[in-house]
Amino acid sequence: MNPSKSVTPPLWLLAELTYRCPLQCPYCSNPLDFSQQKKELTTEQWIEVFRQARAMGSVQLGFSGGEPLTRKDLPELIRAARDLGFYTNLITSGIGLTAKKLDAFADAGLDHIQISFQASDETLNAALAGSKKAFQQKLEMAKAVKAHGYPMVLNFVLHRHNIDQIDKIIDLCIELDADDVELATCQFYGWAQLNREGLLPTREQIANAEAVVADYRQRMGASGNLTNPAVRDAGLLRRAAETLHGRMGIDLPQRHADCTALPCHSARQLPVAFPSVLERTLDDIWYNSFGFNRYRGFDWMPEPCRSCDEKAKDFGGCRCQAFMLTGDADNTDPVCSKSPHHGKILEARREANCSDIKIQQLQFRNRSNSELIF
């Protein structure tokens, strides 16, 4: 465990306001047992969390979920965060968004909006989201967001069922005048891990997608188009654990809808007790709690991590992934080619290459499925 003085303050607070959501994406990062989570922080409790985070030095606040638009107090939360000096970002599916709400959010001081899509066409988007009306609503709201003058990021979670249309995805983003595009290769936690065999792209799909994005970047740069398509790492398909280091208490605290403070979306599954913000202050949690300090620094690392010349870059990789795939969070992340458990990744790749799971065979993120699992 590191002494408190060696730990830098958190820069970004991700507030998962709720697990309620009108969509049913089979790759959702929310916990499988979300149906068992009954509590949400009140308006006043959230504002107190914001105040504590700002006092610690946090400068950016993301409103997430579930779908944050299901919170009727969202304008009040935005205003409180803005008054505290946060740069605020709404991370939304766009379902439930209206021009009237955009006006209210602007009045409250919202700085930035990210809208997620499931695909570049209505049919595939409907199949993945579990809603036939979602695609047109997203299109309308993306246009409305730009009309209201917000900076806008469009987010697409990529997996085997939509990655081959990546050229059409980028074309749609250009058409909608997105300021940035996040092509986020599916991260296999939560519902995505449950559906991994049916979602994991093949290596050939990833290579083709990267080539398409590289070509677009070159052509768009030459034409002066400022839209920036950014590809988030391919997770199980390559060794790039350095992209995960911020998820283990370096600069990314997350506050979940049930009052628990977590260092990442998936840390709930670890055999570590994480504290509630109703019982301890954020400052105390960040600097002194066992859960947030358990995997800081290098002392906890086994070999080959401890003597690896890249440990200051990847921080031993993802503890949640190590736990999911090996049953022991202390093990070297199997994504690393040096890991004695790397065979599990090779096995997952082989399964992906042989898989013929259709979209309708996936387990969708909804309350009924959550209750069946738990």
Curated annotation (Swiss-Prot):
Supply the name of the protein.
Answer: PqqA peptide cyclase
Q: Which GO terms describe its biological process?
A: pyrroloquinoline quinone biosynthetic process
Q: What keywords sit in the KW lines? A: 4Fe-4S, Iron, Iron-sulfur, Metal-binding, Oxidoreductase, PQQ biosynthesis, S-adenosyl-L-methionine
Origin organism is Kluyvera intermedia (Enterobacter intermedius)
Radical SAM core domain residues are 7-222
Q: What NCBIfam families does the annotation carry?
A: PQQ_syn_pqqE (TIGR02109)
Q: List the lineage, top down.
A: Bacteria, Pseudomonadati, Pseudomonadota, Gammaproteobacteria, Enterobacterales
**Gene3D superfamilies found in the cross-reference section:** Aldolase class I
Enzyme Commission (EC) number = 1.21.98.4
Write down the superkingdom of origin.
Answer: Bacteria
Give the residues the record marks as binding [4Fe-4S] cluster: C21, C25, C28
The record's comment on protein family reads: Belongs to the radical SAM superfamily. PqqE family.
